[in-house]
Curated annotation (Swiss-Prot):
InterPro entries: Class_I_gatase-like (IPR029062), CobQ/CobB/MinD/ParA_Nub-bd_dom (IPR002586), CobQ_GATase1 (IPR033949), CobQ_N (IPR047045), CobQ_synth (IPR004459), GATase_3 (IPR011698), P-loop_NTPase (IPR027417). It comes from Rhodococcus opacus (strain B4). One of its GO terms (molecular function) is ABC-type vitamin B12 transporter activity. Catalyzes amidations at positions B, D, E, and G on adenosylcobyrinic A,C-diamide. NH(2) groups are provided by glutamine, and one molecule of ATP is hydrogenolyzed for each amidation. The active site is at C343, H434. Keywords: Cobalamin biosynthesis, Glutamine amidotransferase. This is Cobyric acid synthase. The gene is cobQ. Gene3D superfamilies: 3.40.50.880, P-loop containing nucleotide triphosphate hydrolases (3.40.50.300). PANTHER family: COBYRIC ACID SYNTHASE, DETHIOBIOTIN SYNTHETASE. Residues 262-442 form the GATase cobBQ-type domain. It comes from the Bacteria.
Length: 512
């Protein structure tokens, strides 16, 4: 197959959120990049509190940063021009081209629709001019027809840019054939004309047993299934949003310990959790068992408690108090148990949070485990950062409104230039820096300190855990799955020629 003939763009839509859109796009990106194709990802609009900072100080969804890495590219606001960061069930922070613009509700958002359509169209056109292939990812599901009028990322994008659409469904959840059929059936005829085929995700067992169902799906829709991606036990990439972070569930696939002891980590699954991927670096370590928890009883046998980031720090702090987790953290810390807070979690560990920006609650007492006072400012800090933690070079990124007004504890590290960052008091650690735990040497030092405080004398950190290499291996595994299980000639034809003409329309009462 001639690699130079890979040209064009398509949209990967899903029957539901978390159906496999992000991982399929990442796998396709990696597969094409390995073949020397100039490829870029694009998600017109993302709704997620898992984000990263670009080189120019913008903010995009974590999934698009991962897809960019799969392409061999640095993250850019071009890949995710519109980001919605939920702060409550009814409002989200609107980020356009990497910058926070305002807070919107569902009805307010309509006022921005015209401008956002222009932004999305400009960025996609620019990417298509600069790259051989642009792989677009939808948002949620195109079957949410109540949102069709304001849609920027699904059929609204496909219609505007004349993109062929692949619909992916997760068979592990059951009902995938109905989901695929129904997704097409509820669409308007003009939208149906762009649905060119299907992909089944997370299939377990003998694929030949699925063949009769796929044959019937083709007969009913006139569209082929371009591939069946098998369930991969070893695949656990960065969660795109909170749907991928399940409470009271393990993180990753823990490898056996190097020494005699395990370290047990309880990571608090906050309602408005952000950048949950910080915790995944801990789960990469052999002998470290990490669980997301929502029940205070889960903290009783934890060696380390982690408070991750939050898009609604004060609201999530109140949730901790209501359900008893705040008291459980206090008991854990009182007996010398290690606690780590990252960004919003760090702010919660302090003595007071003054928030007239996100919650409007004013001064709110923190958990009091650090001598720290934080005040929220309207402008968000967005930066890639580097520094030094006790002789170890470290790096990360900052995304927060909170400013430290007073810190009575020693710093956890120093930023480049010498500014103090973070806090440490006994076995309580805190930092505003996301991504810090991805620095391998720092993570090992921290875990050694945690093990000492927790009395896990038999725990030994592995000397060679490389989080960046693990992520790269995950992307290569995804690319292998795509390469081995998708109809690549059909995919190449779709990219080059678009959706075939004359695809049948599935009539339904909803369309009459």
């Amino acid at each position: 197959m001639s690699e130079s003939r890979w040209r064009g763009a398509l949209l990967v839509a899903g029957t539901t959120s978390d159906a496999g859109k992000s991982v399929l796009v990442a796998g396709l990106c990696r597969m094409l990049a390995r073949r020397g194709v100039r490829v870029a990802p694009f998600k017109a609009q993302n709704m997620s509190n898992n984000s990263v900072v670009t080189l120019d100080g913008g903010e995009i969804g974590r999934a698009q940063a991962l897809q960019a890495a799969a392409c061999g590219l640095e993250p850019s606001v071009r890949f995710n021009p519109v980001l919605l960061k939920p702060g409550s069930d009814r409002t989200s922070q609107l980020v356009v081209r990497g910058r926070a613009v305002t807070t919107v509700g569902a009805r307010d958002y309509i006022e921005h629709r015209g401008h956002l359509r222009t932004v999305v169209a400009e960025e996609l056109q620019s990417l298509r001019a600069d790259y051989d292939v642009v792989l677009c990812e939808g948002a949620g599901s195109p079957a949410e027809i109540n949102l069709r009028a304001t849609d920027l990322a699904n059929m609204g994008l496909a219609r505007a840019a004349d993109l062929p659409v692949l619909v992916v469904g997760d068979i592990d959840r059951g009902g995938v054939l109905a989901h695929l059929f129904g997704t097409v059936a509820v669409l308007a005829p003009e939208d149906q004309a762009l649905i060119a085929g299907f992909v089944i995700n997370k299939f377990r067992g003998d694929v030949s047993l699925l063949a009769p169902g796929l044959g019937q799906l083709t007969a009913m829709t006139g569209r082929p299934t371009l591939g069946v991606i098998p369930f991969a036990e070893d695949l656990w990439l960065d969660a795109e949003d909170s749907l991928g972070v399940v409470g009271d569930a393990p993180v990753g696939r823990p490898a056996p310990p190097v020494g005699d002891d395990w370290l047990r980590v309880a990571a608090i699954r906050l309602p408005r959790i952000s950048n949950s991927t910080d915790v995944e670096a801990l789960a990469c370590e052999p002998g470290v068992s990490v669980r997301w928890v929502t029940d205070p009883s889960r903290l009783e046998d934890a060696d380390l408690v982690v408070l991750p980031g939050s898009k609604s720090t004060v609201s999530d702090l109140e949730w901790l108090r209501r359900n008893g987790i705040a008291d459980a953290i206090a008991v854990h810390a009182k007996r010398g148990g290690p606690v780590l807070g990252v960004c919003g979690g760090y702010q919660m560990l302090g003595s007071v949070i003054v928030d007239d920006v996100e919650s409007g609650r004013g001064a709110v007492p923190g958990l009091g485990l650090l001598d720290l006072e934080v005040e929220f400012a309207p402008d968000k800090v967005l930066a890639q950062v580097r520094g030094d933690a006790h002789g170890v070079p470290v790096s990360g990124y900052e995304i927060h409104h909170g400013r430290v007004r007073r810190n009575g504890d020693p710093p956890l590290l120093h930023a480049r230039g010498g500014a103090a960052e973070g806090s440490i008091r006994g076995a309580v650690y805190g930092t505003h820096w996301h991504g810090l735990l991805e620095t391998d040497r720092f993570r090992r030092i921290l875990l050694d300190d945690v093990a000492e405080h927790a009395g896990r004398t038999g725990f030994v950190t592995a000397p060679d855990t490389d989080v960046a290499a693990i992520r790269t291996a995950q992307l290569d595994l995804l690319a292998d799955l795509v390469e081995q299980n998708l109809d690549l000639p059909a995919l190449q034809a779709l990219l080059g020629a678009g959706a075939p003409a004359g695809l049948p329309v599935i009539a339904s009462d909803l369309l009459r």
